[in-house]
């Protein structure tokens, strides 16, 4: 994977940061996107290769297009896109008490952000007849978590998008997949109510959270050249929770 170019959204922390570190260790050139890049600037020494850092709001379609145009011009290609930016929104709230504003805010980041990046990366990949796109879904998108309507529905939409795009570009050399983790311990989950986190963890047969390293290891395989005959698929990383 040396000399490949990867865009990673939500790269300043959590899943995105772990994935970026692992890809960097494999010699991948990184274009890291986040709305708050101060943490990336502070931790730039963690990467084996010097990343290009872009401050961008992925809910802003114009800004996303401009950023991807800059990345394509700077590197001359884009081989990998990992959409790891995501928010949970307000949780531990039943559907009748969930605000419309919360639903829209979560969908804007989790679904529309992933749609915008893939929309503008795919035309860069097509002439090269190669690309790896990975949308970060969630087990909540497959099974639904009570009290998390916005998050669960947005991740279900992300999984559906991977299925559609996988079929649409199956003959182009571009693969589009998703991954559906159960609880991976990150700062995002530290902000959840204890009851909500326990509800999620209790459903995992291994009775533990996944680790960022476990996630990064699987992601690096999914976006590698070795993973060449799987597209439109949602990979499981749930400690045995997934039933399909």
Where are these regions (language model features)?
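Active-site helix of classical SDR
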Residues: 118, 154, 162
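Alpha-helical segment proximal to the catalytic Tyr-Lys
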Residues: 123, 167-171
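Canonical Rossmann dinucleotide-binding motif of NAD(H)/NADP(H)-dependent dehydrogenases/reductases
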Residues: 2-30
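Short C-terminal tail/terminal secondary-structure segment
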Residues: 92, 143, 220, 231-244
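Residue(s) in the substrate-gating loop at a strand-loop-helix junction
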Residues: 138
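Short, small/polar-rich loop/turn modules that mediate ligand/substrate recognition or access, typified
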Residues: 170, 175, 230-232
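Substrate-binding pocket helix/loop in short-chain dehydrogenase/reductase
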Residues: 92-95, 99-107, 189, 200
